[in-house]
């Protein structure tokens, strides 16, 4: 049985797509090993079928501290990869992949890199010259060196299986009208619970890097929404830290809004199933999941994201009328409230965005697996 090594870490946005790819490769008969870091250890579940290895590399702004750490990590990675004797190593970008990728190059193991964002990250750009192939999620990608263009294969992003199992209801059957709607999506193998068709559900989450701003900004926006349209029947599903939940619950209760809170949603499919609109960051895995099921979103890109890649992700969708990009530095509760009200009042705009999302949907788990098999 041939072995394949996947390398991803740092955030859930890198981790979960790599796990989804691993599950597809296991179905094809490969033994899949996954090298990740301590930050992603929290996401590892017993039912995941890939074999995990923790190899941590702590970042430091001091080059004299970082280089010794990197050297030690590379030596550990060389030992690990040598014992595995893998056929290929696939890196998903970010600093946690640096040591294993250097080890693969040293051992002459073929490497493939996958860029999930619309902007080629620094680590992936560095390893582009060593890669056999460069898989990308977007048809157009910024920061790509000229020499690397011949290595490009558009595979799309890799979406988790439980998200792929969500079924998109045909546009003609959605029945979305102002004040009356149906669920946009439903689980293939589950019974959809009865619900109030007049209820408009917004799913709010800030990604694996936290949602402090969302707790403050969005609760203020919802207050404005309800002040402007008191008859609106609103349901909020929101990621929020425990210390923020008490305050937000008090606000929503006074507004007679139904709500559900969690610090972290383990099964996003359940929340996607209920939502009519999403408000979120613009990480690559979030965008790919929403694209796959055609669920429209207002994106508030994380301004501190490396190379501002979240802004480029969201702007690309906005330019294709497949979403809305509101920059954190320019946003206000009033602006966000106006956008929410505009979309609730104009369901055809939501339908059009959903259709445009579905136009760029790809079976990334299959296409990337096919590419790996070509390299092997």
UniProtKB/Swiss-Prot annotation:
Subcellular location, principal: membrane
Pathway named in the protein's UniProt entry: Cell wall biogenesis; peptidoglycan biosynthesis
UniProt-listed Gene3D superfamilies: Glycogen Phosphorylase B (3.40.50.2000)
Membrane topology (UniProt): Peripheral membrane protein
GO annotation (BP), single: regulation of cell shape
Residue numbers binding UDP-N-acetyl-alpha-D-glucosamine: 11-13, 117, 160, 208, 310
UniProt signal peptide: none
GO cellular component: plasma membrane
Reactions it catalyzes: di-trans,octa-cis-undecaprenyl diphospho-N-acetyl-alpha-D-muramoyl-L-alanyl-D-glutamyl-meso-2,6-diaminopimeloyl-D-alanyl-D-alanine + UDP-N-acetyl-alpha-D-glucosamine = di-trans,octa-cis-undecaprenyl diphospho-[N-acetyl-alpha-D-glucosaminyl-(1->4)]-N-acetyl-alpha-D-muramoyl-L-alanyl-D-glutamyl-meso-2,6-diaminopimeloyl-D-alanyl-D-alanine + UDP + H(+)
Location of the protein in the cell: Cell inner membrane
Keyword terms: Cell cycle, Cell division, Cell inner membrane, Cell membrane, Cell shape, Cell wall biogenesis/degradation, Glycosyltransferase, Membrane, Peptidoglycan synthesis, Transferase
Domain of life, per lineage: Bacteria
GO molecular function: UDP-N-acetyl-D-glucosamine:N-acetylmuramoyl-L-alanyl-D-glutamyl-meso-2,6-diaminopimelyl-D-alanyl-D-alanine-diphosphoundecaprenol 4-beta-N-acetylglucosaminlytransferase activity; undecaprenyldiphospho-muramoylpentapeptide beta-N-acetylglucosaminyltransferase activity
Entry's EC annotation: 2.4.1.227
Function: Cell wall formation. Catalyzes the transfer of a GlcNAc subunit on undecaprenyl-pyrophosphoryl-MurNAc-pentapeptide (lipid intermediate I) to form undecaprenyl-pyrophosphoryl-MurNAc-(pentapeptide)GlcNAc (lipid intermediate II).
Assigned protein family: Belongs to the glycosyltransferase 28 family. MurG subfamily.
Identification of the protein by name: UDP-N-acetylglucosamine--N-acetylmuramyl-(pentapeptide) pyrophosphoryl-undecaprenol N-acetylglucosamine transferase
